[in-house]
Amino acid sequence: MFTQFYRIWRKYSYPATFETGGSDATSQCLLGLIGLGIPGTAQQIATPVSRFLALLSVMRLPTRNAEGISALVTLLAPNTHARVTPHWPQKVALTQPASLSTTHPVSLSQGTPLGSAGFDANSQLHLALFTEDTKEARGWLPGNQLHKDLLVLLRVYLGWRCTAKLQLSLPIHSLPEPVLGGGPVLLGMTGVLGLGSEAWQVGEHDTITINLGRYQGLHSNPQYRETQHVTYRF
């Protein structure tokens, strides 16, 4: 009987023994199930590691899917809806474009792309956000807190080899009017000329789409070295 009561107490006492930042033993064991319980991991992530305790169901899966990315958005902003489209093509610069050359001949029968760039649809996804909450909408803009937190969570969830194109859709009537002394307006994002005037009648369901940039795990880091000794062969 005492053993059963002890098991019940151990099962339901976790909220009482929870420590700030998930530093208690139970939280560390749960974080260890998703690979975040290694000592020193919290210092490598620019967000409280305890946030991932709410994402155990998606983080423990061996694959990364659209439901997991939507869970990240819901955790940060409950009033924001997310739509994930996999295999979103992106332009990739070709290191050696096809050309008429005897040194590096190419064959069009092998599907060789023409031009200086090609399209890659294997390592990038499209994340479309939509919200009618003005507070959350301001937080999603580049440089604000929600945008920064999303990039950090995507780095932990997606890793380094996948990129994501981020876009935000808002109702036009929720944007601030571009007047002096009014709300803050970002040119190219939330600044719409003529908004609020009688000449422009905005529909209830009219929206505007804003590009929020791109999440990229790995960035190119070329190293240019000065050549000191050159041998010319004529």
Predicted segments, located by residue:
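Feature for intrinsically disordered/low-complexity regulatory segments and propeptides
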Residues: Y6-L76, T80-T103
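Long, hydrophobic/aromatic-enriched structural stretches that serve as scaffold segments
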Residues: M1-F5
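C-terminal structured domains
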Residues: A71, L75-F234
